[in-house]
Amino acid sequence: MKNVLLASSLLIMFSGCAQKDKPEIMPKDIQIKTAMLAAPEDKKEGAMVYGYDEDGEVAVLREGTNNLVCLADSPYNKGISVSCYFNELDQFMKRGRELKKEGKETMEIRKIRGEEVTTGKLKMPEEPSMMYIFYGSEETYDKTQGTLGDGQFRYVIYTP
């Protein structure tokens, strides 16, 4: 009987820990709507959108018909942050996500990608390319509508 109680207690304890580690993944339509907050108005309709599947892995949520790629908010980070960039930057951005998944820190990711660009392993656009970022606090994020009350824009220009 003691073994059954001990096993039950351990099972409950470990299942509770596992549930805490799993982030909340928003429904696909809400991820897309939130990602579009960063997109220029004239590019929203045809933008490709990456988001997160039920396992928390990056996945294509919507194929695109223009040259804009948008990324839904990461369920692993605090706050809300969505971004869009032109498809010429997609390999550079994918590489950053790969390195992050490997556990690399921001400065190490920058260094590795910089070296890979310098050696030609990672291709960058031949002309300047814009990235649009829309961010804000979780407290003003409406999970049912995909809207962000205190959102602000930030822009990054990648130059060759």
What residues fall within each predicted segment?
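Short, linear, compositionally biased motifs with a strong N-terminal bias
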Residues: 10-11
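Primary mode marks residue(s) on the alpha4-beta5-alpha5 output face of response regulator receiver
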Residues: 21-160
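Positively charged n-region of N-terminal signal peptides that target proteins for export
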Residues: 1-4
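C-terminal motif of bacterial Sec signal peptides marking the signal peptidase cleavage site
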Residues: 14-16
